[in-house]
Regions:
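Active-site groove signature of glycoside hydrolases
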Residues: 110-129
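A short, structured active-site edge motif that brings together acidic residues
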Residues: 76-88
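Short, acidic/polar
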Residues: 30-43, 97-114, 159-167, 261
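N-terminal binding-site loop/beta-alpha segment at the start of enzyme catalytic domains
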Residues: 1-77
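Alpha-helical scaffolding within the catalytic cores
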Residues: 1-4, 105-107, 163, 187
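Beta/alpha (TIM)-barrel catalytic core signal, keyed to glycine-rich beta->alpha loops juxtaposed to Asp/Glu
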Residues: 126-293
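Active-site mouth loops of central-metabolism enzymes
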Residues: 22-34, 88-103, 125-130
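Conserved, mostly hydrophobic/aromatic
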Residues: 6, 18, 36, 43, ...
Length: 293
């Protein structure tokens, strides 16, 4: 495994981390704790030290799995989680973006993750209006001062949300998470240069384009109802799979497509780490191999 500096945080993260939306049981698979424990044990053996999650991945389900799995090895892991999409009944409408409600989400995430601090706490795919909330960022920076959060981040919904990236330094944000992969590299045009100017760490999410760059899918692929990809229009999936298959024609015969896709992202000097999702140890190992290509 290779390691990269996470911007101005000074942290050194594995160039391949772990994304954990799948652990929220939203991607066609139900996980058990023993299975998750084995995945993280193998990840440690491979030198991976970064995991990204969110409170909305199964309403803390993913965080709970991670908290159990890392209970005895917390200090060697850099844990990133997110806020803003809490769907509990006591947080109706847009209230989950307000400072007092985000504070509740933070406490719930700390409890689920079984830790007294979160390394990177990220604003999760909100709007410009939701970002421009002085009370929210004042509260979050107080959590940094209190030691409950080490660094703040913004996970932008789309690369077009450059305003949020450009505001990072003023808000006390050190890390940006963005979509970046071989079929959607729009972030390279504006987002990544802004991150470089501000010395922000960058986490590249969906580096496998929702799994389509793994080479496992054909344009007529169907997904089970408990898989988020089933919620998309079939023609959208079909188009993305077709694009992915065209890109994968560039992959050498002796290289796994997913390894290549991770390595493709890591070619850009602004990228600190890629955070592909996984369902199995085999997928974990294939992704990790991308660090050495």
């Amino acid at each position: 495994m290779k390691y990269r500096r996470l911007g101005k945080t000074g942290l050194h993260v594995s160039s391949v981390g772990i994304g954990t939306w799948q652990l929220g049981n939203h991607w066609g698979k139900q996980f058990e704790q023993d299975e998750v424990n084995n995945i993280f044990a193998r990840a440690s053996e491979l030198g991976i030290n970064l995991v990204d999650t969110a409170e909305c991945y199964g309403h803390h389900v993913s965080e709970n799995f991670i908290g159990q799995a890392l209970a005895s090895s917390r200090d060697r892991w850099i844990i990133a989680t997110k806020f803003g999409h809490n769907r509990r009944s006591e947080l109706p409408g847009e209230a989950h973006w307000q400072a007092d409600q985000v504070r509740l989400q933070l406490e719930a995430s700390l409890h689920a993750l079984k830790t007294d601090y979160i390394d990177i706490y990220q604003f999760h795919s909100g709007t410009r209006e939701q970002l421009d909330n002085d009370d929210l960022w004042t509260m979050l920076n107080k959590q940094v001062q209190a030691g409950k959060v080490r660094y703040l981040g913004i996970s932008i919904g789309q690369p077009s949300q450059l305003y949020q990236v450009d505001r990072a330094t003023a808000l006390g944000v050190s890390v940006i998470q963005t979509i970046y992969n071989a079929i959607n590299n729009k972030a390279a045009e504006t987002v990544l240069p802004s991150c470089q100017r501000q010395d922000l760490g960058v986490l590249a999410r969906v580096p496998l384009a929702s799994g389509f760059l793994s080479g496992k899918y054909q344009p007529d692929a169907q997904f089970p109802v408990n898989d988020v990809r089933a919620e998309r229009k079939p023609e959208v999936n079909q188009q993305q799979i077709t694009q992915a298959l065209a890109v994968l024609e560039n992959v050498p015969a002796n290289v796994e497509p997913a390894s290549w896709a991770c390595a493709w992202c890591l070619q850009h000097p602004a990228i600190s780490s890629v955070i592909p999702g996984i369902k199995t140890i085999e997928q974990l190992q294939i992704n990790a191999a991308g660090a050495d290509l």
